Amino acid sequence: LMLTLYPSKGLDRVRPAAAADYFLRGGLISWLSNTIIGIVPVARDKAGTGVDVLEPVRAALKAGDIVLIFPEGTRGDGEEMAQLKSGVARLAADVPEAPVYPIWLQGAGRVLPKGEALPVPMNCTVLVGDPLHWRGDRQAFLGELRARLEDLKAKAPPQRWA
């Protein structure tokens, strides 16, 4: 869904951060994830083991790629925003020249529910906010990002399926 927001000319620079344990588990999904989509794999199963699971994302940002990140650490369930994880703030601190654009996706959970393989034809609303830049404080950054996401959510049209 997010890849459709970008012109095809620069699409090779747009790379979703994605769970390596899911998208690189083998077979067709691994091939599609690497060859067609060009994911930045995040080894979330190694978090807390001393391995820097964000290093591939950091490297992609430093290389000038546009990396799509769900700041909750996953795409979540339904239309509710989960607690934001610190990873997005750590990346902003490490690569301050890379702006963070808050994006609110309304209806994405209905188009491709978590655990499903095939999308369901349905309309989605995508709202993109002004860029957020690192200013030196992790909690302030996360608070501002959350406030901007909540503002975008409030601007979204009413859900017709509710």
Question: What role is predicted for each listed range?
Answer:
Residues 14, 65-71:
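Generic beta-sheet signal
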Residues 156-162:
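Short, flexible loop/turn segments with low-complexity composition
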Residues 46, 72-76:
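Short glycine-rich anion-binding loops that position phosphate/pyrophosphate groups of nucleotides
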Residues 1-46:
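Catalytic core of membrane glycerolipid acyltransferases/transacylases, capturing the structured
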Residues 31, 66, 76-140:
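A cross-family acyltransferase "interaction/gating" segment
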Residues 19, 72, 105-107:
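Cofactor-binding loop segments of dinucleotide-utilizing enzymes, especially the Rossmann-like FAD-
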